């Protein structure tokens, strides 16, 4: 049986690092999406204040199953 997935782009942030920022993105998206099947970190960035990184950010593509009524 063939299947279809939809992909959305979200941005997660954390003061603790890029991995945590990506996890935040997946965790929060999973609260409102069913069938999350994969994630791909597309880019990473950070906020800097007074020469120090204050927030790590990841732009994440999240794939989830498209449900069929068939």
Where are these regions (language model features)?
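Short, conserved loop-to-beta-strand elements that form functional interface hotspots
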Residues: 39-48
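C-terminal structural segments of small proteins and small subunits
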Residues: 51-70
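A structural signal for short, well-ordered beta-strand segments
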Residues: 8-10, 44, 58-64
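Generic "edge-of-domain/loop-turn" microfeature
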Residues: 17, 46, 65-69
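Short, well-ordered alpha-helical segments
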Residues: 2-37
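Short N-terminal signal/transit or membrane-insertion segments
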Residues: 1-2, 62
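Short connector loops at helix/strand junctions that flank enzyme active sites
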Residues: 5, 36-39, 53-59
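N-terminal presequence-like segments and the immediate start of the first folded domain
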Residues: 4-7, 42, 70
